Amino acid sequence: MPPLQRKWLLHTIILTSLNLRNILFQNLIRRWDSHLRKYADRNLNRSDLVKDKNFQNIYSKVGPRKSKYTLAPMERCYSLYKAIKYVTKANISGDIVECGVWRGGSAMLAALTLMENQETHRKIYLYDTYEGMSEPTDKDIDIHGVAYRLLWKKEKELLTVSLDEVKKNMSSTGYPKENIIFVKGMVEDTIPNTVPNQVALLRLDTDLYESTYHELIHLYPRVSSQGVVIIDDYGHFQG
């Protein structure tokens, strides 16, 4: 087994699939709850989400029903919340890294959770073009067999969020500004030029094959032992 694959097995990997925005086009709209169940974490009890008042307080500030910051459903937000709590409780060394930021909702949730656990010394690295998603390649085919390039043309406006807007959203959390690192540009150009030495939690949400592959090649080796890797759209694209 190649070294990268061996190391892969040593880490906790949270694989969540399905991105809501990818089913809003080309007549793919369907009942969200029934579609989500096919990809749900079988170990996740929804009652836990409702009963967890600390999570609900944070989710109310970033969740899709309360704001414009994220399209992630409550289950995925809770997975991220629990992952952040895990790395703090287990004293996993390293910073928080997100590739593919959109409006900053997931990063805001991470920041608020870190603050809840008095962990504001960790840096949060946010990689994005802040000008929209780069054009998909022929490898980017979704679970319905639809070339993502076709959907991308419809989504371009939705996916385009400026750096200034994300900075404003992140600032609203109260997390120390000096510990929020915004890295603007395509990840193929910015990584590994600007990267932390160690990563406690790596969240990948750039959707596309080429960018995700590049991120894993350069950032995965920096994930601390027993750290967390979240691939947001794992299973949604054939690549």
Regions found by a protein language model. Name each.
Residues 1-44:
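N-terminal auxiliary segments of SAM/dcSAM-dependent transferases
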